[in-house]
Amino acid sequence: MKFAIETINLHVYYGRNHVLRGINLQIPQRGIFAIMGPSGCGKSTLLRTFNRLIELNQDARVEGEVRIFGKNIYSEDVDPIEVRKKVGMVFQYPNPFPHLTIYENVAIGVKLNKLVKSQKELDERVRWALKKAALWEEVKDRLNDYPGNLSGGQRQRLVIARVLAMKPDILLMDEPTANIDPVGTAKIEELLLELKTDYTIVLVTHSPAQAARIADYVAFLYLGKLIEVGPTRKVFENPEHELTEKYVTGALG
């Protein structure tokens, strides 16, 4: 079986700080895979290795392999820009470009990478991405407005639309609902459940409850080590490790 993402003996250092320690992980194609663990355990660092965004930190050093659909993305012949086209990223804080309209926010990556040949194709791509992100009906009459008037949840769905417009294979989500109200969170969780049939979604979450609600598989990290990984129900109801049990029951934060 060819996994969407596979790490082999993955180590990450920030200077002398050994942040990830020998991570061996296999993430299946399609579905939602949640990475959970207490603050500072290495969740976001691990996520950033999956599209080489980690390399934007000059102090970071990566050892081992990260394979995307079987190809080691840290090979010398791999362009990180090309990796990021296929492995999209959504961050914790909704970050639409404030100086661009709603339409332009979705269109910008498509235009810069020349993914369409005409204005008509661009219009269709923007509409498709906004529909895919469950935002079209809310913004279709104000595409030329700026995103400042959108709610936090709407801004995050706009960012998701911007990523989807690039037609990636994998979506990386770094605590995408951490700064969004419960109503906005519920809409984004519902959206992810719809998207998982077409995409591999890797979700970093600070909330075991969120992982239990929407993830098909979960991985538990602690102090830079992969403690346990498996189907969500099994990990929550019958964990193999005491640390995992403490975390999912709230005894370890």
From Swiss-Prot:
GO terms for biological process: phosphate ion transmembrane transport. It is found in: Cell membrane. ATP binds at G37, P38, S39, G40, C41, G42, K43, S44. InterPro entries: AAA+_ATPase, ABC_transporter-like_ATP-bd, ABC_transporter-like_CS, P-loop_NTPase, PstB-like. Pfam families: ABC_tran. Keywords: ATP-binding, Cell membrane, Membrane, Nucleotide-binding, Phosphate transport, Translocase, Transport. CDD domains: ABC_PstB_phosphate_transporter. GO terms for molecular function: ATP binding; ATP hydrolysis activity; ATPase-coupled phosphate ion transmembrane transporter activity. Its EC number is 7.3.2.1. It catalyses: phosphate(out) + ATP + H2O = ADP + 2 phosphate(in) + H(+). GO terms for cellular component: plasma membrane. It is a peripheral membrane protein. Its main location: membrane. Residues 5-248 form the ABC transporter domain. It is an enzyme of class 7 (translocase). Belongs to the ABC transporter superfamily. Phosphate importer (TC 3.A.1.7) family. PANTHER family: ABC TRANSPORTER I FAMILY MEMBER 17 (PTHR43423:SF1). Part of the ABC transporter complex PstSACB involved in phosphate import. Responsible for energy coupling to the transport system. NCBIfam families: 3a0107s01c2 (TIGR00972), PRK14267.1 (NF010860). The complex is composed of two ATP-binding proteins (PstB), two transmembrane proteins (PstC and PstA) and a solute-binding protein (PstS). This is Phosphate import ATP-binding protein PstB. It comes from Pyrococcus furiosus (strain ATCC 43587 / DSM 3638 / JCM 8422 / Vc1). The lineage of its organism: Archaea, Methanobacteriati, Methanobacteriota, Thermococci, Thermococcales.
